[in-house]
From Swiss-Prot:
It is an enzyme of class 4 (lyase). Homotetramer. This is Aspartate ammonia-lyase. InterPro entries: ApsA, Aspartate_Ammonia-Lyase, Fumarase/histidase_N, Fumarase_C_C, Fumarate_lyase_CS, Fumarate_lyase_fam, Fumarate_lyase_N, L-Aspartase-like. GO terms for biological process: aspartate metabolic process; positive regulation of plasminogen activation; tricarboxylic acid cycle.
Length: 475
């Protein structure tokens, strides 16, 4: 049974409340928990965000202590508390407010101030809640507003999360690249508009998947760099209200040291405090990755379709029974789930777009939902890349005979004859093949367009795999 002795008294603008004695958070967080019961997903469920906010508090304490904005012993205690959170993970579970919240992120900033203050108090031998010694607002939040601390912590967190995503995209890329080498000498039919086109190798197809992911890595790295231009030092609206002389440059310098990232002050702090354009760009890059990854999964599902009435060029690992009514049915469940992840990311991009547009005048209060969308997109894309490699791509095999049969029974190979019989004759050959069911070789020989030796040369496997090879006809 909980008794009143297990609580401490805290006071804010609205009055006095009982706060659990063991909680590192305080009255402002308590009110946020009561006010925003939306998703059952809390800030503690996004630990990278907590770390980003704590890094901001460490950088500001260093700058404030150096400039004399707060006493040096208090600055040291705050820094020590931040270091403990960052190095050990202590208090990461002390952020119970919902990820959906009003107030432009004030609840997250208040929560961070309270946790850091109470941990700092313990480190110097005081009890939680003794705010006359170290105060969440006057000391931890010194020279700050939610409007610069929150977006800066958010940007650092998103940037670091994207680095983890990039690592997993590279992990998936390596699997496709390995398969490209494994399947380098397996001939297959390329298709455009779902119709037979011209031959290629399975290796070339998988290499294209790998290169596609390389492009996304480059694009994400380039775009994520926008997040490192921060508005720390702007305080409420960008004018730097209540900051000491030289604070902005110094605090961003400390932030770069704390994070290990190339953080720079925004060119114009008023613009940076009101604008969310970087989020639109960064999530747009996430959407682009999702669009491309979903297309790859579409291809994997199509190429593995069958087993008797589909393409059946490749085999995906069999992971679970696919039907409650149809015996022996196995479905491409991993590409399917990755498709769904990608759809969610694409939807989140719309959320980020609308929320970024919804600011008024000197502030956009919708950053919490931008944060929720961005962290969710990054998290599920990261997991999807790992899942796709581990449960699908690594185990893909090719049905070589089926692939080659499609090539040699296809009308598409008539394209290789264009330089020798002309496009018009190629059309005629293709039309006869379609009408009669005969093969290209058979019709060309019947029409006397080429000799059997010439056809052997032109339609050799070597020539089909390397279409710039001119064969003996051009020697």
């Amino acid at each position: 049974m909980i008794t009143m002795t297990q609580f401490r008294k805290e006071v804010d603008l609205l009055g006095e409340r009982d706060v659990p004695a063991e909680a590192y958070w305080g009255i402002h967080t308590l009110r946020a928990v009561e006010n925003f019961n939306i998703s059952n997903v809390t800030i503690s469920d996004v630990p990278e965000f907590v770390r980003g906010m704590v890094m901001v508090k460490k950088a500001t304490a260093l700058a404030n202590g150096e400039l004399g904005a707060i006493p040096s012993d208090i600055a040291k205690a705050i820094v020590a508390a931040c270091d403990e959170i960052l190095t050990t993970g202590k208090c990461l579970d002390q952020f119970p407010s919902d990820v959906y919240q009003g107030g432009a992120g004030t609840s997250v900033n208040m929560n961070t101030n309270e946790v850091v203050a109470n941990l700092a108090l313990e480190k110097i031998g005081h009890k939680k809640g003794e705010y006359n010694v170290i105060n969440p607002m006057d000391h931890v939040n010194a020279s700050q507003s939610t409007n610069d601390a929150y977006p800066t912590g958010f940007r650092i967190a998103v940037y670091n999360s994207i680095l983890k995503l990039i690592d997993k995209i590279q992990y998936l890329h390596d699997s496709f690249d390995n398969k490209a080498k494994e399947f380098a000498n397996i001939l297959k039919m390329g298709r455009t508009q779902l119709q037979d086109a011209v031959p290629m190798t399975v290796g070339q197809e998988f290499k294209a998947f790998a290169v596609l992911l390389e492009e996304e890595v480059r694009n994400l790295k380039r775009t994520a760099g926008l997040l490192l231009e921060v508005n720390l030092g702007a305080t409420a609206i960008g004018t730097g209200l209540n900051t000491p002389q030289g604070y902005t440059e110094l605090v961003v310098k400390h932030l770069a040291e704390v994070t290990g990232l190339a953080c720079v002050p925004a060119e114009n702090l008023i613009e940076a405090t009101s604008d969310c354009g970087a989020y639109v760009m960064v999530h747009g890059a996430l959407k682009r990755t999702a669009v491309k990854l979903s297309k790859v999964c579409n291809d994997l599902r199509l190429l593995s379709s069958g087993p008797r009435a589909g393409l059946k060029e490749i085999n995906l690992p069999e992971l679970q029974a696919g039907s409650s009514i149809m015996p022996a049915k196995v479905n491409p469940v991993v590409p399917e789930v990755v498709n769904q992840v990608c759809f969610k990311v694409i939807g989140n991009d719309t959320t980020v777009t609308f929320a970024s547009e919804a600011g008024q005048l000197q502030l956009n209060v919708m950053e919490p939902v931008i944060g929720q969308a961005m962290f969710e997109s990054i998290d599920i894309l990261t997991n999807a890349c790992v899942n796709l490699r581990d449960k699908c791509v690594d185990g893909i095999t090719v049905n070589k005979e089926i692939c080659e049969n499609y090539v040699f029974n296809s009308i598409g190979i008539v394209t290789y004859l264009n330089p020798f019989i002309g496009h018009h004759n190629g059309d005629l050959v293709g039309k006869i093949c379609a009408q009669t069911g005969k093969g290209v070789r058979e019709v060309v020989l019947e029409k006397g367009l080429l000799t059997e030796e010439q056809l052997d040369d032109i339609l050799s496997v070597e020539n089909l795999m390397n279409p710039t090879y001119k064969a003996k006809l051009n020697k």
